[in-house]
Amino acid sequence: MQAFVLRAHRRALESLLRAGPAPSRIAIVGGGLFPRTALILTRLLPAAEVTVIDASAANLERARRLLADTTVRFAERRYDGEDESGYDLLVVPLAFDGNRDALYARPPAPAVLVHDWIWRRKGTSRVVSLALLKRINLIRR
């Protein structure tokens, strides 16, 4: 199942990333439990500086083990939805516990990839999987 999920996400992310300049600084919110987005983006954009932001020390420790052969950085903090202009790209998970509508209305970074339900199409969008009922939306400032 993990291989299927990784392939499906990779296809969607690869397609969306072609829609603009390659980001050099990326923040991934909540990517610690299973860092699929970090695994994919470090392969698609090997020159990019990637930071995983997660409030859980245990999740970050798991991510460190899975990403040991990468240069990914880790920040133990809760993402508050505020401005993240220091990054070219911010990635927000489906499980984001915050104001998703505010992310769409006022993107906190120049480009924001929002994992969302398949019926919530916003901006430039790609379906991840019908089986997962999931899509990724790309929002730009």
Feature-to-residue mapping (PLM):
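Conserved SAM-binding strand-loop segment of SAM-dependent methyltransferases
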Residues: 69-79
